[in-house]
Amino acid sequence: MLIITDGAKETAKIASAIAAALGDVKVEVKAAGDFMGNDILPADVFFLGCENPEPETFAYLADVLRHINLAGRLCGIFSPKSEKAVQYLSALVHDCEVALHPEPLFASSVDSVKTWAQNVVSGSFCTRNDSK
């Protein structure tokens, strides 16, 4: 599993909480600035988080996601506070055809991180991201 963040302090806290919530599963947490295109290939499940929409560190990640098909992979998105950041992340993964969890995680709901993260991993929502 892979968690990619913008590297912001609050986003990193949520990423750590998600990784901890997944228990014994191997989870790699990466700042987007350290992301390489082949990091995402072995990940059946990945999470993306940012504090604000269009962080500069996401430029390469955005380019990769525009040119890769990740159909069948599961994805959860999160932000410490920004609905616009979540809208950005949702649009970012739209073209790569991931199965996007319909409910993003916000910092205000960090108490429910474990349930949310496990739901993303289980794929029980199984809705392909068809929104435009």
Question: Whereabouts are the PLM-identified features?
Answer:
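FMN-binding flavodoxin-like domain, especially the glycine-rich phosphate-binding loop
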Residues: I4, E10-K13, A17-A32, G37-K132
